[in-house]
């Protein structure tokens, strides 16, 4: 190859690199480069399709481009979601209103019409039902929870624990 390797050498480093793709086009580029795909809570595209549909397309295009590139390993795909299980009164106070009629949103970022994914906030059984319908979430290998750091470490740990205890097992994770 003629390439210099990174020192100190870390075997398998190339398989631990992720690219945060904000569009279907950059997801294809990531596949061609041979890096894992990280898809966030927004895409710099707005076609009229739902965020989950756009993101599912992004994942499918990534996997197709990966196959065409002929890489000799299977990449990982992560999606980010704002998910808040409501398990007590404090959760309801912080997030209860967000879950009522929450939808994707369209906005403009750096001149691009963009689609933003909705915030999931509901009691665990409702979350499981909603998340099972999120095609991109079901297509991914990993989910990253985006939570508001301004609520403090203890409350953020509560959110993560509520998700891990009440939601993830029902999704088969």
Predicted segment positions?
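Active-site-adjacent structural elements that line small-molecule/cofactor binding pockets in enzymes
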Residues: 1-173
